[in-house]
């Protein structure tokens, strides 16, 4: 994925060194966009191997509306461990906002169910939006949403998705986010009778942590390989019925993982 490597290079070359919440320090650029045509292959990094199991299970966890890490732990996924409390709870994070956004009148709004309904009844709508950024509850979240708003767009029978990510940890987080939202787009396309279109990833504060510079430069020495193909069980017609076993990635050849510390 040359597109991703171009982002790494851009921030290393043109970013501004800044302090940050974690005390680690970053090199950051504000405002950047990447586009991935999902017909050209599944956009997962080939210049370092990603843990696809974590990506899929996290997405299924979001779609369940779950905010406790028990499901993730049961499936060997540890990416949320650092932020959970002693009971495994994270507060009203992504899954809660996606599936149970609290309204002032006491109702809870299932944004994903509403999105699916609109895609069936009014696919030309400009309101095909899901937001995880709830100002009233941000302070109760273990980690406020980094990928905070996404919008869908239907044209010529193809479903495209644009994600706005306010805070983008380029080396560790962004590769997961690309694959996760590409997969979500493919899943929603299948259950709404559409074909996958583009995934557009718009970044706000796009940063590389100072203790990731060496790893980023190593990754830039590697040559991207052909993208793999994601196969989704065609029998699944209900977005909330997908299981891990319904996904198969064929042809994924990647360079070895590059370890880097997480900034908490």
UniProtKB/Swiss-Prot annotation:
PROSITE patterns membership: THYMIDYLATE_SYNTHASE
Compartment(s): Cytoplasm
EC assignment: 2.1.1.45
One Pfam family named in its UniProt record: Thymidylat_synt
Binding of dUMP, residues: 21, 126-127, 166-169, 177, 207-209
Protein keywords: Cytoplasm, Methyltransferase, Nucleotide biosynthesis, Transferase
Enzyme class: transferase
Reactions mediated catalytically: dUMP + (6R)-5,10-methylene-5,6,7,8-tetrahydrofolate = 7,8-dihydrofolate + dTMP
Metabolic or biological pathway, per its Swiss-Prot or TrEMBL entry: Pyrimidine metabolism; dTTP biosynthesis
GO molecular-function term, one example from the UniProt record: thymidylate synthase activity
Gene3D superfamilies xref list: Thymidylate synthase/dCMP hydroxymethylase domain
Residues that hold (6R)-5,10-methylene-5,6,7,8-tetrahydrofolate according to the record: 51, 169, 263
Cellular component terms (Gene Ontology): cytosol
Biological processes, Gene Ontology terms: dTMP biosynthetic process; dTTP biosynthetic process; methylation
Transmembrane segments: none
Family the UniProt entry places it in: Belongs to the thymidylate synthase family. Bacterial-type ThyA subfamily.
Known partners and oligomeric status: Homodimer.
NCBIfam families: PRK01827.1-3, PRK01827.1-5, thym_sym
HAMAP family: Thymidy_synth_bact
The protein's role, per its UniProt record: Catalyzes the reductive methylation of 2'-deoxyuridine-5'-monophosphate (dUMP) to 2'-deoxythymidine-5'-monophosphate (dTMP) while utilizing 5,10-methylenetetrahydrofolate (mTHF) as the methyl donor and reductant in the reaction, yielding dihydrofolate (DHF) as a by-product. This enzymatic reaction provides an intracellular de novo source of dTMP, an essential precursor for DNA biosynthesis.
Protein name in UniProt: Thymidylate synthase
